[in-house]
Amino acid sequence: MRTSFRPILFAAILFAALFVLPSNIKAQPPQEVMNAAETKLALKKLNILGSALYVAAHPDDENTSLLAYLSGERKVCAAYLSVTRGDGGQNLIGTEQGALLGLVRTQELLAARRIDGAQQFFTRAIDFGYSKSPEETFAVWGREAVLSDVVWVIRRFRPDVIITRFPTTGEGGHGQHTASAILAVEAFEAAGDPARFPEQLKYVETWKPKRLMWNGFSRGGGGAQANRSGLISVDVGAYNSLLGKSYTEIAANSRSMHKSQGFGSAERRGSALNTLQTIAGDAPGADLFDGVDLSWRRVPGGEAVGKILEEAERTYEPENPQASLPLLIRAHREMSKLPADNSWVE
């Protein structure tokens, strides 16, 4: 049976859309009951069918502002793939080291995702401390084994866009950082190739993302600013009027979950431009999701579902949320008519 990490799980939506945050991955911790504004946002997200996967090496490497923006402003299924669990980091809040520290930092990542709205994935790779080069890193990790894990996540989550935190050219300052970017590039191609890791195809199908981007930075005139080709800007400082917060404020709270590393940042509002440079795939025009159908039309026969969900969002009553149930039931019935092999409904 083919499976995906990003289904809407509509069997639970009749309650989840009104009372709890929808869960797109069974391993995620349960969410708290939503208020009226969060419920409205959840209804909006039901009508957006898109996904983005952020890839880096460790817990705390992720760009929480971009994840919050993707989940809240673009309303796509966003996820962070941390290649390791941070076993080799410091611990400022306890005595745990090694694998036990990895457990602590795993929980910190899950806590961060509950705030910024993204999902969380890992591979089998161990953080063994500072590494001077990607070659040294791969010698410890086992390149093909970890690559297979990254390919597995891509084939199951099926992202439209993949974004790396670090470049493949070493400016990340850590061998594991560079290795995570190299793996993302290799997995971008391998996930769509049935000859690569064919044993996975018993459970998943091949998947080819639309594009691979680098979330660039500029240091000493280098980084993304050194090559303007295929470069776009994203303002992750946008304000969410439903939540009464900007995505940088949400991100600050998310990042502050990395307590063992002493990480945290002050909440702030205002424009916060991020640069994204095309590494592989189709270069976007002005928008990260150019060329990607984010509507229910991407599922054969799904247009009727989209229209019903639009009506549910438009007629939602904050003081009478149960009034949306008849429309959600109609949408559920329409979803039951969709092809069984679509990856958006389970």
Predicted regions and their residues:
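Metal-dependent de-N-acetylase/amidase catalytic core
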Residues: 2, 6, 25-53, 133-137, ...
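Bacterial N-terminal signal peptides
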Residues: 8-22
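Active-site rim/loop-helix segments in enzyme catalytic domains that contact anionic ligands
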Residues: 28-156, 178, 185-189, 193
